[in-house]
Amino acid sequence: MQDRFVHCIAQLPQPLADQLVPLLNQDFVGHMDAQQVADLAAATQMSQDELLLALLPIAAALAKPPISEFYVGAIAKGASGDIYMGANLELDGEALFHSVHAEQSAISHAWLSGETGIEDIIVNASPCGHCRQFMNELVEGQAIRIHLPEQATQPLSHYLPYAFGPADLNIKTPLLSKQQHEFTLESADPMIIEALDHLSLSYAPYSESYAAVVLETRDGATFCGRYAENAAFNPSMLPMQMALSAMARHNRDFSEINRAVLIESSQGKISLVGATMDALHAVAAVELEHIMVDPV
């Protein structure tokens, strides 16, 4: 079992802890498929809602909050029935806008894994306004069920009434809808090809500044992030923060980064290069490779 889970496993009901210990091996990054969830519920004689709330300490153990020291865990349940854990991330000594909220982390985990819908969000503290707006960008966002400890389950519309969202700006394919934007680039570099793939799946309907980041560690592992814009602009999630959040879930140290690539559309109304460099240089002494590509 990974060291980061040792403390939280002791907080769980013993039957659940016994079932989880074999799962929390070195490969565990916060994802459980629908069958694993069903098996855990059966083995522990818990309802699925009870189980997911009980798993929140595991999700919170994925957090890196050096500023607030407040560990928040979230779980996104996808339309597939799989669950995706996420946790808050803060960059030590840096401006707070670099932070990733737990709900953003969980949702980006699901998006990067190919989910096209989120049905439930389980979180150990009431979602802040930033996260409510971020969730409202999703497919059928207002219908997402929000689960909190010791509170009745409510749809997002309960927490964000009279919401402003993508439909108000005539966006017909909100976040998690299949995106496929075509760009031209000739490269045999596997890392750049991977970045191009994620660029084509990014979500930027307001600025058309489609973008993706790929980070490579010294052992050759790669971690990706895509731009996820928001109708309210400020809750948009930058690709560098998404990639760093993925690294944190994988229990990797940012000092392991030895290469970083940002790829973005040449036709966007904005550029993410400045914000991306700021975040990268806060965690690693690596120069950013910046590539602009033309849409087809």
Swiss-Prot record:
SUPFAM superfamilies: Cytidine deaminase-like. Substrate binds at residues 88-90. It catalyses: cytidine + H2O + H(+) = uridine + NH4(+); 2'-deoxycytidine + H2O + H(+) = 2'-deoxyuridine + NH4(+). Zn(2+) binds at residues 101, 128, 131. It comes from the Bacteria. GO terms for biological process: cytidine deamination. GO terms for cellular component: cytosol. Binds 1 zinc ion. Residues 47-167, 186-296 form the CMP/dCMP-type deaminase domain. GO terms for molecular function: cytidine deaminase activity; identical protein binding; zinc ion binding. Signal peptide: none annotated. The active site is at 103 (proton donor). Its cofactor is Zn(2+). Its EC number is 3.5.4.5. It is an enzyme of class 3 (hydrolase). Transmembrane segments: none annotated. The keyword Zinc applies. Keywords: Hydrolase, Metal-binding, Zinc. InterPro entries: APOBEC/CMP_deaminase_Zn-bd, CMP_dCMP_dom, Cyd/dCyd_deaminase_Zn-bd, Cyt/Deoxycyt_deaminase, Cytidine_deaminase-like, Cytidine_deaminase_bacteria. Homodimer. This enzyme scavenges exogenous and endogenous cytidine and 2'-deoxycytidine for UMP synthesis. Belongs to the cytidine and deoxycytidylate deaminase family. This is Cytidine deaminase. It comes from Shewanella loihica (strain ATCC BAA-1088 / PV-4). The gene is cdd.
